[in-house]
């Protein structure tokens, strides 16, 4: 996506729409819609442009992929995960979140999705909410993202996933002191 400029992206999407393509159709083998794929590439100008175009074209901001992940979860690092936990100590532990290091600029894309009605309490197949994804993404901008989510409603800060972990637990594991302090105010 790095070399795909904003104008090319818009032209490509417009051509697809003119040919009868619908943005809510699965765009990859994991069942991600084009909006979810664009959210995964939101760190690039073309990705942000695609997200805006797709939202303005009526893409479903709450469409889920085979993992139960919404586009906003993919913005904050959602990735394919088969649910298996490695049984050997030498293998790193993996999660469905943390697949992308997020930046401060992602707040603009997050706000766009929230304004379009993204569900802040949706859960993926493993019980993770948007706050779990934000906590697992990176320490840069995580508190600001969580604060923006709070501005759009009352997410369940104490919600635990299928492993019994809350967003606060994940933030503590990542040593994200700023997010930990912020989430403690709402716990």
Model-identified regions with their sequence ranges:
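Ankyrin repeat domain, specifically the short helix-to-loop turn at the C-terminus of the second helix
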Residues: 14-22, 52-60, 111-119, 147-156, ...
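Ankyrin repeat A-helix N-terminal signature
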Residues: 1-8, 37-47, 74-83, 95-106, ...
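Ankyrin-repeat and related helical/solenoid repeat scaffolds used for protein-protein interactions
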Residues: 121-174
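Ankyrin-repeat boundary/"N-cap" motif
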Residues: 1, 26-40, 64-79, 90-97, ...
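Ankyrin-repeat-protein effector appendages
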Residues: 91-93, 116, 162-165, 170-187
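N-terminal segments that cap or nucleate solenoid repeat domains
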Residues: 12-26, 30, 34
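N-terminal start and proteolytic maturation junction detector
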Residues: 15, 85, 93-94
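Low-complexity, intrinsically disordered tandem-repeat tracts enriched in small residues
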Residues: 10, 26, 57-59, 63, ...
């Amino acid at each position: 996506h790095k070399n795909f400029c904003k104008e090319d992206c818009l032209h490509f999407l417009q051509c697809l729409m003119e040919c009868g393509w619908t943005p809510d159709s699965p765009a990859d083998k994991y069942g991600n819609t084009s909006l979810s794929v664009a959210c995964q590439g939101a760190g690039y100008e073309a990705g942000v442009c695609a997200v805006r175009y797709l939202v303005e074209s009526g893409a479903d901001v709450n469409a889920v992929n085979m993992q139960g992940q919404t586009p906003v979860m993919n913005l904050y690092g959602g990735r394919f995960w088969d649910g298996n936990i490695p049984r050997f100590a030498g293998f790193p532990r993996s999660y469905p979140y943390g697949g992308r290091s997020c930046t401060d600029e992602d707040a603009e894309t997050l706000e766009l999705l929230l304004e379009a009605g993204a569900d802040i309490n949706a859960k993926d197949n493993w019980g993770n909410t948007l706050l779990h994804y934000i906590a697992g993404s990176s320490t840069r901008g995580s508190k600001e993202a969580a604060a923006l989510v709070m501005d759009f409603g009352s997410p369940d800060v104490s919600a635990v996933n299928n492993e019994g972990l809350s967003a606060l637990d994940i933030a503590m594991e990542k040593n994200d002191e700023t997010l930990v302090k912020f989430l403690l105010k709402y716990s």
